[in-house]
Amino acid sequence: MRWLFWTSENDKDECKCNNKPSSNSDEKPSIILNSSKDWNALSNATNWSHFLEPSNLIPTVLLTSGILFAVRIHRRYLRRIPEATNISPSYLRQRSILGKVTSVGDGDNFRIYHTPGGMLAGWGWLRKVPTSKKELKNNTIHIRIAGVDAPELAHFGRPSQPFGEEAHTWLTNRLIGRRIRAYVYRPDQYSRVVATVYAYRFLFFPQDIGLQMLREGLATIYEAKSGAEFGGPKQEKKYRDAEALAKKKGKGLWKAKASSDWESPRDFKSRMNAIDQGKGST
């Protein structure tokens, strides 16, 4: 059809342009599709085998293994245990604890500040053991020496047993401020851990403290209704032999064994418990 005579060529061009379909709605899917294709092409074009080359793979494996190994070592050997109740069951009869003695409460128990790793971990020259009561509060492990029973000190209104002071003084002189290693066996009813204890008087000569107390006549074999803890039959035999020899020689508390009023630490505690029960019933 012929356009009217007054219609110009420019108008015709504008009409042609306006009659073209809009392409905006088709552009966005096209862009997304193209981007997806570009990413897939880039991924496929990446040479992933480059990361498997020995020059890249070996350092990565070594670094990862080193980090995991360091974490395991820290958790197993360098983590500090604040109190006896925090000792993991996996430690009992399997591991030992190294620490510095901060106080001696009686003739057969004391407290240590756990120093995992010892001098190799910097304790004593890079890291200091606290000394104030405030710093040590809730930060010491209460240890009961396995297999031995020392004479009682005066406490809770009870009198002191003969040789109680001597046993306490001996243990204090041997342990206070020293490094010890405790082979832990089990917890007891007083939130302590029962352990065989070795004190380092010299660098390479640890001394079994419980065994030495028996030899000096400053303790007896621990006898209990539920069974005493020695750390094994061999250790028990060694302790009983030491007690028998001290008794034969009349050392320490065995000097007065012939006396009619002589009491073992176990007999003394049983008598005190009976007196306390009698007071409670009246």
Curated annotation (Swiss-Prot):
This is Probable endonuclease LCL3. The chain crosses the membrane at residues 55-71. Signal peptide: none annotated. Its main location: mitochondrion. Belongs to the LCL3 family. It is found in: Mitochondrion; Membrane. The keyword Mitochondrion applies. Residues 95-256 form the TNase-like domain. It is an enzyme of class 3 (hydrolase). Ca(2+) binds at residue 149. Disulfide bonds: none annotated. It is a single-pass membrane protein. SMART domains: SNc. GO terms for molecular function: endonuclease activity; metal ion binding. GO terms for cellular component: membrane; mitochondrion. The gene is LCL3. Keywords: Calcium, Endonuclease, Hydrolase, Membrane, Metal-binding, Mitochondrion, Nuclease, Transmembrane, Transmembrane helix. Its EC number is 3.1.-.-. The active site is at residues 144, 152, 192. The keyword Transmembrane applies.
